[in-house]
Amino acid sequence: MQNKVHVRKQDTVMVISGKDKGKIGEVLRVLPKSGKVVVKDVNVVTKHQKPSRENMQGGIIHVEAPIYSSKVMLYCTKCKSVTRINHKILDDGTKVRVCKKCGETF
């Protein structure tokens, strides 16, 4: 069963718990089966890469690892704070996400 993930790709989010608490970044990938998201420059892990045909050099690389979506919250760039969202239907029938604090659309 897939978990409901409240953020989408390219959303700006803030980490609200864990070792990276307070960091703001962009969602790179959403993994709905595991309920996790990959955020830019958050939860960076060190990976030891063996030399291969594609990467002749090998070495140590840094990659963003997934974190649970419950540890991130949507960040509104207009009011500069984390916020929950409302869903609003516009006159033309499209459904948009709206900041609860300032009314800005995402």
From Swiss-Prot:
Q: Which GO terms describe its cellular component?
A: ribonucleoprotein complex; ribosome
Task: Give any Pfam family that matches.
Answer: KOW
A Gene Ontology molecular function term of the record: structural constituent of ribosome
Q: Does the keyword Ribosomal protein apply?
A: yes
Q: Which UniProt keywords apply?
A: Ribonucleoprotein, Ribosomal protein, RNA-binding, rRNA-binding
Gene3D superfamilies registered for this protein in UniProt? 2.30.30.30
Question: Its biological function?
Answer: One of two assembly initiator proteins, it binds directly to the 5'-end of the 23S rRNA, where it nucleates assembly of the 50S subunit.
The annotated subunit structure for this chain is: Part of the 50S ribosomal subunit.
**Family that this chain belongs to:** Belongs to the universal ribosomal protein uL24 family.
Recorded protein name is Large ribosomal subunit protein uL24
Please give the organism. Clostridium tetani (strain Massachusetts / E88)
Q: Which gene encodes it?
A: rplX
